[in-house]
């Protein structure tokens, strides 16, 4: 459980975070420079907010009014940095046990075995792979029995194959970890896979918070739609209570019920378009192909619209075979339920 109400003036903006999440697997998603890592540093006690309070798992870590500021070493937090912060002059074993008392050091062999590091325990960090370095960092953190885990872009330096395997290992570890884990990332896949709840931030402000799967399903804001992978976003204008115009695409879209007020844009995910051969009713787009990118398991079609802004249509393998057989469709169609209404 994370309860944050803090302000902190940074170079380009003021970080203002106010949230209360009743979950112990929390993700913070945002673009570069949005303030994600600063939130973790404040939780860990590395940085001090200008005002407010921080409470994690019921423990008050910081409160500017009550003059509470628990020292970083007393917060019992395990912090996994992007580069893992291994000491280059120490071996794998020495990196794990550094600063531990003799009783804790006796557990080192168990952690080496648990993380598959026994064979490289005498190697220096420059002699091990990125995946091995990630496991060393996790062993070093967990041997200290932290109450909370913080991950700051911890997997971003790994290639896709290694990242997938390390994340699977982390997910397995977290099943037995009773405390909270907070992940900062710009990777939507990582947040979706590992986090029950999430915060989306932009320039130091929260744009979305809540259940991870619900936010991906209905992001509600342009910022969240972009960060969760929506490639097609257009500003809109209302025509009437159930019709709007997508200004960037030059197309009118009809809805079966009254549209909510306050919508400024819509989004359509690239895989939510359906090809149409011949005449069709509903929300359709004229199909004028600009270019195509062939990928190993899918194709990306870039469609020229009347409004001037291209649309991306993602075509999976089964649909690729149909298009090869029938040729390009006459139109693209989108179901009303797949149109994201955004503020």
Give names to the regions the model predicted:
Residues 4-38, 45-48, 60, 231-233, ...:
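Non-catalytic connector elements of ABC transporters
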Residues 59-64, 105-120, 172:
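Conserved ABC ATPase "signature" region
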Residues 61-79, 215:
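ABC ATPase NBD coupling module
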Residues 124-128, 132-134:
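Conserved ABC ATPase signature
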Residues 143-147:
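A short, proline-enriched helix->beta-strand linker immediately N-terminal to the Walker B motif
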Residues 149-153:
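Catalytic Walker B motif of ABC-type/P-loop ATPase nucleotide-binding domains
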Residues 185-249:
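Internal alpha/beta loop-helix hairpins
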